[in-house]
């Protein structure tokens, strides 16, 4: 949905669910991890937290915020000497669940939930700080932004289907629908 067609309540709900909830969860559980100097904090962001997607403004903003929160938390833990508490942020592409029903994934296939779970488990086991799923998307996004002028990046995203991926989006149907 266009930013200009999104209600204030809908935007607030997306931010509360996707971003604010991370603050409350971290505040609740991480102090005990700091005390033990042990634990893993895993936050789920999205590739939309690395690359803006047309008609997904609120969602992208909420997922970019998660990336920033986790980087900031990691810095705070480092400064406090809690080096045994590991932070990981997972940025998956579209996952084949009802949440993204109708989405057009472009040239990439939808991810299976198991692929994302495996990436999370790998992050916990090996202390990965930033994980994209599929793994190569992080490099693709960063290299495009580093090497190409922004209008060319936007054209690439258009050709790859990223900018039009939400045009056919319907989302999960609720019982009321």
Language-model regions, residue ranges each:
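A short helix-coil junction within the Rossmann-fold of NAD(P)-dependent oxidoreductases
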Residues: 28-37
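Active-site-adjacent segment of SDR/Rossmann-fold oxidoreductases
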Residues: 51, 72-85
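Active-site helix of classical SDR
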Residues: 26, 62
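Substrate-binding pocket helix/loop in short-chain dehydrogenase/reductase
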Residues: 2-3, 7-12
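Active-site loop-to-helix junction immediately N-terminal to the catalytic Tyr of the SDR YXXXK motif
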Residues: 52-60, 103
